[in-house]
């Protein structure tokens, strides 16, 4: 019995020595938004932090207001800062202070008007935006009357599509989807009889593996075309341009993270995902119909060679 007790004591000591120690008793706060890759990625990174001994809580947050929340320390980090959708909010928070640009993903992003390839059969001048406008009547619905219907992203993504339509004099009406899932449902419904459709889309995600398509080519985005009427092809208008065609995808963090959770902060600095990896995260939820937490664990299990070095 004495030998057994000694053995148990030794095992317990080894387990205690091997267990990761929390940087703080307070939880790291991870944000949850309304598109699949971000939700899965938050859980992937959160589980990595948990493997380091830290506690993580997940909170649903507005995808624009989150930068103010991170700046104030109410949310600890943001794993998907898309240049096109959230660059302005991110820059504004950086100027105020309290938030850091921690890392840049390998992924290159694009966010803009997009159509599945069957739409090009109905409007062969695509992807030129003027050709799209000439075909506006083919996208009209009872909801939009004689104007073409563009299905935009959720309102909180702040894509300024209505401003773009007005600036470029397009015969389109913007209708905002309630969620990313509503956009995929629109495409699935249109595919059945090859109805021409133009929607907001972005890369990386899983969609082009299911529905091959193209982005609409608007006047090229240049710095200031969204804020300065003098920049861009229409002299007195802002948003007379597309979104960045090669946008960044960054990671932001509360500046107090490095002192409060130094182990996880060091790991976060090393985190970087490719377009293919992010698309896979979205696919696990949107195609394979996994719960985001399960998708995150599946991704971690299949990709230890990718993320383990981030914790070393």
Pin down the residues of each PLM region.
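A bilobed periplasmic-binding-protein/Venus flytrap-type ligand-binding module shared by bacterial periplasmic
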Residues: 111-122, 247-260, 283-284
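C-terminal lobe and pocket-closing loops
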Residues: 207-267
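Short, well-ordered beta-strand elements
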Residues: 23-37, 54-59, 147-151, 268
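Pocket-flanking alpha-helical
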Residues: 42, 59-97, 186-188, 206-211
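Ligand-binding pocket segment of bilobal, Venus flytrap-like solute-binding proteins
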Residues: 75-79, 149-227
């Amino acid at each position: 019995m004495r030998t057994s007790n000694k053995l148990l004591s030794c095992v317990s000591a080894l387990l205690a020595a091997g267990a990761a120690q929390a940087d703080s008793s307070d939880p790291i706060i991870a944000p949850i938004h309304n598109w699949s890759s971000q939700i899965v990625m938050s859980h992937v990174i959160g589980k990595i932090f948990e493997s380091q001994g830290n506690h993580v809580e997940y909170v649903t947050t507005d995808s624009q207001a989150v930068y103010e929340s991170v700046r104030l320390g109410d949310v600890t980090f943001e794993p998907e800062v898309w240049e096109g959708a959230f660059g302005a909010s991110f820059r504004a928070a950086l100027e105020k202070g309290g938030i850091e640009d921690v890392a840049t993903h390998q992924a290159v992003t694009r966010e803009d008007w997009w159509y599945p390839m069957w739409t090009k059969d109905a409007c062969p001048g695509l992807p030129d935006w003027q050709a799209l406008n000439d075909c506006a009547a083919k996208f009209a619905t009872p909801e939009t009357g004689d104007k073409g219907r563009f299905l935009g992203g959720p309102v909180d993504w702040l894509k300024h599509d209505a401003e773009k339509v007005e600036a470029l004099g397009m015969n389109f009406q913007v209708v905002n989807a309630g969620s990313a899932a509503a956009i995929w449902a629109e495409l699935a419904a249109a595919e059945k009889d090859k109805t021409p459709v133009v929607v907001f889309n972005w890369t990386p995600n899983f969609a082009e593996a299911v529905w091959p398509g193209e982005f609409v080519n608007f006047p090229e985005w240049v710095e200031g075309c969204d804020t300065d009427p003098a920049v861009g092809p229409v002299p007195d208008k802002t948003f007379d341009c597309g979104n960045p065609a090669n946008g960044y995808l960054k990671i932001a963090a509360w500046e107090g993270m490095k002192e409060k959770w130094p182990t996880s902060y060091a790991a976060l600095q090393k985190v970087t995902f490719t377009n293919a990896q992010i698309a896979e995260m979205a696919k696990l939820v949107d195609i394979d119909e996994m719960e985001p937490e399960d998708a995150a664990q599946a991704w971690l299990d299949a990709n230890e060679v990718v993320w383990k070095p981030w914790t070393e």
